[in-house]
């Protein structure tokens, strides 16, 4: 398979003989297929399962007992070493607390992005990963060399592509990362796993935010922040049409869970100081759309999109593709740095729904192949 050949070339290009490879094994089919691919290429990676565990208040992670059983079976099948690493305290401090703090500010968090940046490729590397030449994962992403610079790049399967969840990592991190399954479709991964008789070959994909486990998201928010009843106001008329339990339960663009009749209704704005949710009615209300995004900072993984294009001045407007949420579609737009406002400005060619401050705008080249990085949205209109 082409992607498997790419992984071999990537390792050989490093010039490291007999490289030490760590695999972040979750117990799912993707990371299990990673182990199979590396083993068939002649490598003997060490498997690591990152355990989050349960905190004092009863918040628990995903079905870790089943996960560990799967990883143990995988390690036994290939006679590979396995280590279980507990990063519960670090996960709570860096990811869960970030989520709570972000929601409390009235912003929309991205815990998956922070988990990759701070835990999987951050704390793990500081504790264990630094001893290894490469860290391999089952993410649907690839890496590409352009003029001898390594870039994070998209997977050929747009539905499964996960570069948007990786867009806050840095160059040091991407240099160590291997994505052996990144160039395959999910169907191809399943076929590979079935042929290799992997224990997780038919296991269902995990869904949702991992640290919540079986806890409903709103239940998690309520346990963390409590409730604070407030008004729901129709933006166009200024009339109070309902009540909510707290602005932190709602995000821009939200349709479900408002408890309003005569809809559909969409959240178009939040007044944090007054604890008011503003909504508009209709299947496609214009108030839920915008074409302009502002970001205070831009995290460039390898090089900035301007450097990639050979442009020295970031105030020069350049054409890019971008995403503001995890979808298969890319949006065309222009990006520039506004020196007067100290803001990066992203202007979309078409109106986009639900621009939520706190979320991240992920920036790609116009062919949506290279993922340059991302910036947190501070304003959308």
Identify the meaning behind each predicted range.
Residues 1-167, 187-188, 267:
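ATP-dependent adenylation/nucleotidyltransferase module used to activate substrates
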